[in-house]
Amino acid sequence: MASGQQERSQLDRKAREGETVVPGGTGGKSLEAHDNLAEGRSRGGQTRREQMGEEGYSEMGRKGGLSTNDESGGERAAREGIDIDESKFKTKS
């Protein structure tokens, strides 16, 4: 049990130094903050998927995956002739 507490203390110290110690916890100033941020981001994505439906959520991800530092996903899709069905982005009523 003491080693678990020691490990959490080390992770907390690293988080306070600005290192990301939990996937999705970027920006937290402590281990607890990292945990909370990661959980909130995960829950937010799940909620969005429920609102849009699996198909719309996947289509939105396709568009986002096309984005670069120079242009948005929509601009790149138009330039390359990739069809993105934005009607699927609508939330379910």
Swiss-Prot record:
GO terms for cellular component: cytosol. Pfam families: LEA_5 (PF00477). PROSITE patterns: SMALL_HYDR_PLANT_SEED. Residues 9-19, 31-52, 73-93 have a biased composition (Basic and acidic residues). GO terms for biological process: response to abscisic acid. Residues 1-93 are annotated as: Disordered. Lea proteins are late embryonic proteins abundant in higher plant seed embryos. It may have a role in desiccation tolerance by acting as an osmoprotective protein or as a desiccation-damage repair protein. PANTHER family: EM PROTEIN, EM-LIKE PROTEIN GEA1. Belongs to the small hydrophilic plant seed protein family. This is Late embryogenesis abundant protein B19.1B. It comes from Hordeum vulgare (Barley).
